[in-house]
Amino acid sequence: MTVTETLAQAVERHHPRLVMLCSFQKEESVLVDELVRIAPDARIVTIDTGVLFPETLETWRAFEERFGIRVAVEDATGPWTGPENCCSAAKVAALERALAGADAWITGIRREQGATRANAEPVEFDERRGIWKFNPLVDWTEQDLWRRIHERDLPYHPLHDRGYASIGCAPCTLPGSGREGRWAGTEKTECGLHVA
């Protein structure tokens, strides 16, 4: 299935009880552009930890302006006490609130992002949450993303131009390829949003 077909299926089967999670990375540049063409009123949600990069906030504004959307916010702010507490207590709890009442959610995960995502399918049942999970970009490469971003002149996160392949919270993210810049110096590669 193409990205458009996967999103159309998600919208046809689950809208308006469908949520797209948005972290304003290159994957979401493509997904938001495609999704609003199919369902301009789709619910797009971000998780604000209170320690996002200033560039993330700028990209957020650029998305809203370019795509004519209002991104809903789930607040995950609180005292930053390190990646384990922040990720599990704050981000995962915020995602659960964002998905309350939803039948399905859309993510930007791609197989080439790492071992924990290598077996992802375009459409899968999220056993942990009891809802469907759509991963329209699962087969896309980094090159595919950049080709689309440049073809359509889409807004994208400026930290990608400075060597950040994956962008999360400022205290836990360094430049690096794949997900190696996330929680650098630890074995952690996922915050818990996409892990059962």
Regions found by a protein language model. Name each.
Residues M1-A196:
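Nucleotide-activated chemistry modules centered on ATP-dependent adenylation/adenylyltransferase
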